[in-house]
């Protein structure tokens, strides 16, 4: 025989308000991942916990427009706007990938007013690892 489902908890017992607590973050790391199809900008604290992120896709760009420099610039601006409000003044920038949005995202980060301690390219380079996909024939 099936047991009846007990209704435990009501609206009074649930947590109210926003789950995000606003922390003051003086220093952080800005990760820019620029592929040919999209650009993703993630802002973390120095321990690696994500504070804010944005991508060209979440900014409303669809299809081939996601890989453009303007889309990367918009994504970087959106991700940084949130952390500037939380008091971030200094940051490191780590850029990964071969995409068109690398320089545009870096330009948007520089314009935001955050002091950059260094800019590092962390694109993974194979030491002759996997075989690349076959050449595209159009």
From Swiss-Prot:
Source taxon at top rank: Eukaryota
Primary location class: plastid
GO biological process: translation
InterPro entries listed in its UniProt record: Ribosomal_uS11, Ribosomal_uS11_bac-type, Ribosomal_uS11_CS, Ribosomal_uS11_sf
Family of the protein in this entry: Belongs to the universal ribosomal protein uS11 family.
Name under which the protein is recorded: Small ribosomal subunit protein uS11c
Chain intervals with Basic residues compositional bias: 9-23
Lineage summary: Eukaryota, Viridiplantae, Streptophyta, Embryophyta, Tracheophyta
Gene Ontology molecular-function annotations: mRNA binding; rRNA binding; structural constituent of ribosome
Keywords carried by this UniProt record: Chloroplast, Plastid, Ribonucleoprotein, Ribosomal protein, RNA-binding, rRNA-binding
GO cellular component: a single term: plastid
Subcellular location: Plastid, Chloroplast
């Amino acid at each position: 025989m099936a047991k009846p489902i007990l209704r435990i908890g009501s609206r009074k017992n649930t947590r109210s308000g926003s789950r995000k607590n606003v922390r003051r973050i003086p220093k952080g790391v800005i990760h820019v991942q620029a592929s040919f199809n999209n650009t993703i900008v993630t802002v973390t604290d120095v321990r690696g916990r994500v504070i804010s992120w944005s991508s060209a896709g979440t900014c409303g760009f669809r299809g081939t427009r996601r890989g453009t420099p303007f889309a990367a610039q918009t994504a970087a601006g959106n991700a940084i706007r949130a952390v500037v409000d939380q008091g971030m003044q200094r940051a490191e920038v780590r850029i990964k990938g071969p995409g068109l949005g690398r320089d545009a995202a870096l330009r948007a980060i520089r314009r935001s007013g955050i002091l950059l301690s260094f800019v590092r390219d962390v694109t993974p380079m194979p030491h002759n690892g996997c075989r690349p996909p076959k050449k595209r024939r159009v």
